[in-house]
Amino acid sequence: MKYAPLSRDEGRTLVKIARMAIEEHLRGSKNLRLPDDLPDVFRQRRGVFVTLEKKGNLRGCIGYPEPVKPLIDALIEAAISAATGDPRFPPVKPEELDDIDVEVSVLTPPEPLEVESPADYPSLIRVGVDGLIVERGWARGLLLPQVATEWGWDAEEFLCNTCMKAGLPPDCFYDPETRVYRFQAQIFHEDG
């Protein structure tokens, strides 16, 4: 299925809903009131990640790499999980919310990269455009497209770091049992 890009206004709405979901959850409310006029695209199944930063540092990032749920449902669950369920961080406290910036990444479905030789993988990766998933057995790691840019990585460094995110050796992509996928993301921030 081909996915049309979201508009800037739709992206802003997603970011607002993600923040509302976090705020309501931290208040103990189970009744998140969504606008009645949500765009139809919010009901399409899409992959989505919600990233939280506090004063420029990662504070939580959780999402759905695959389009398994309607975007609005996946967004709300990812937002709450990023704030309360990322095992790398303690749960966000209500008093932290003013210092938290919310970012929403809406993903295209991951596509497997087919190569003659594993050494060819880096040539198929567009840093700053593609996100990566590396998978071998039960191990799976994902890095969003913006991560490589933020860290100044080239394509091979991005691939190695995605391997390590999966808990695998950095050169695991040379193993024929390893699968590499790429995807793209539209990234929306609270500041526009």
UniProtKB/Swiss-Prot annotation:
**Which PROSITE patterns does the entry mention?**
AMMECR1
InterPro entries attached here? AMMECR1, AMMECR1_dom_sf, AMMECR1_domain, AMMECR1_N, AmmeMemoSam_A, Uncharacterised_MJ0810
- Pfam families registered for this protein in UniProt: AMMECR1
Residues covered by the AMMECR1 domain: 9-192
Supply the NCBIfam families for this chain. Answer: AmmeMemoSam_A, TIGR00296 family protein
Protein's name according to its UniProt entry: Protein MTH_857
Q: What lineage, starting at the top, does this entry show?
A: Archaea, Methanobacteriati, Methanobacteriota, Methanomada group, Methanobacteria
